């Protein structure tokens, strides 16, 4: 059974919400005592879930090293998302006020969007989302 579709959406949700929370910089929100704990849970659970999602993806693909360009790009951006979330989690645990986390949050959102678009295109075809068309052309998956 292919568990990848069942597992993959949880880390996407956690990392997306973490990234959006990291980008919110309203003083009133930052003063909440639980704010940093919530973000810490989101980044750590999202990171751990992304590892499980990647593992189930590799299992579903039969541990294939090579394949169609869209598959290779999907895998590359998934690994980029894992790397970005790993660095973000480490930076966050060292200093939750690090301004570099804002840049990483934006990069995580971009990486998740591209990874998800490529994954959706593998299942639904490259014309399922017209907003992804410029990215698909840029990446050469058409």
What are the language-model segments listed below?
Residues 1-142:
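Polytopic transmembrane helical bundles with strong interfacial aromatic enrichment
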């Amino acid at each position: 059974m292919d568990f990848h579709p069942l597992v993959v959406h949880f880390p996407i949700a956690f990392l997306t919400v973490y990234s959006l929370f990291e980008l919110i910089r309203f003083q009133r929100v930052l003063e909440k005592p639980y704010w940093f704990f919530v973000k810490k849970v989101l980044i750590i659970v999202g990171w751990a879930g992304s590892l499980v999602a990647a593992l189930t993806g590799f299992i579903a693909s039969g541990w294939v090293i090579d394949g169609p360009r869209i598959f290779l790009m999907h895998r590359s951006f998934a690994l980029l998302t894992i790397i970005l979330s790993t660095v973000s989690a480490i930076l966050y645990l060292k200093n939750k006020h690090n301004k570099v986390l804002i840049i990483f949050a934006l990069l995580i959102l971009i990486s998740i969007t591209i990874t998800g678009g490529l994954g959706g295109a593998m299942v639904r075809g490259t014309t399922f989302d017209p907003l992804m068309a410029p990215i698909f052309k840029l990446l050469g998956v058409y």
